[in-house]
Each structure stands twice: as structure tokens, then as C-alpha cells.
């Protein structure tokens, strides 16, 4: 596994889905771009999911990543909100999968642990460490910063023996 690998990290959300593209060569990381795909909260659910789909598809076409990582969603007390978030996450997984990318999933605490060293941290800690790890990173809010963290997490985990075995097992 040598050479440059371009990774897209995605932090799914129905209102705002964060995305970030980084490159990894060995242990070094390079920031490519980050941002947020927004859906119109006045539109119906199907239209909002289409907006997320089209926005992510455009990002993939523009940046041509080779691997994708999506943050797993959590279940909260509002079942309807959790279901909608799950649908947005489905779009976040579908778009790169349809583009032929392998899609890895990471729990929020795994992302935090990879970036700040502990599984339970605050948003400001993630922002601070993203800036330390990638000083040239520019992001327009929490969602894009979280997506950078997801991409960094994947860059670290993709070098693990378990990830290599998973890649070898797939055609």
C-alpha cells in the first residue's frame, strides 16, 4: 500500500453534510478541500435527500477520491430525527459506493480517539487537533471539521492489518 491515496471523509446530516478530501502518502497527510452540502429545510424529505446526493456526487466528481469514510450515526430519543439522519447517512454511503469506492464506517468515538487521543471529546478539541494535524486545512464549520476528522481517522486505520485483510478479501 504505497503511493498517494485520496480519501473523502463524510459527516452525514440531513440539514448539513460535511465533507473533506485529504491525501495520504505513508504517514503524511495533505489537505485537499472541505465544505458542507446543505439541503433546503423547507423542501420535502425526498427532495432534501436528492440535494445531498447531487452535492456529494459533484464533490466526488471534482476531487476523484479513491476511498471513502463515513461517520456512523448515533441513536437519540427522537425516533423521527434518528430515522431521517439514517436516511442522510444512507445517501452518504450510497454516493461513494456507486462511484466504485470502498466505504469504511467509523463510530464517533473512534474518530475522536484517532484525532484527539480519547473517545470522548468536545468539538473545539477536534477543531484544534485538525489544525495541528493539517495546518492548511480550511473548513466552514463543525460539519466540515468533523469530516476532516473522519478522513484522518480512515487514513490512520487503513494502514492497520485488519483493514489490509479486508481489502485483500474483496474482489
Swiss-Prot record:
Catalyzed reactions per annotation: Endonucleolytic cleavage at a junction such as a reciprocal single-stranded crossover between two homologous DNA duplexes (Holliday junction)
| Cell location | Cytoplasm
**Cofactor(s) for this UniProt protein:** Mg(2+)
Q: What is its EC number?
A: 3.1.21.10
Cite the Gene3D superfamilies for this sequence: Ribonuclease H-like superfamily/Ribonuclease H
Q: Where is Mg(2+) 2 annotated to bind?
A: 71
Cross-referenced InterPro entries: RNaseH-like_sf (IPR012337), RNaseH_sf (IPR036397), X-over_junc_endoDNase_Mg_BS (IPR020563), X-over_junc_endoDNase_RuvC (IPR002176)
Cite the binding residues for Mg(2+) 1. 11, 143
Q: Upper lineage ranks?
A: Bacteria, Pseudomonadati, Pseudomonadota, Alphaproteobacteria, Hyphomicrobiales
GO MF, one term, reads: crossover junction DNA endonuclease activity
How the cofactor is bound: the record states: Binds 2 Mg(2+) ion per subunit.
Top-level EC class: hydrolase
Q: What is this protein called?
A: Crossover junction endodeoxyribonuclease RuvC
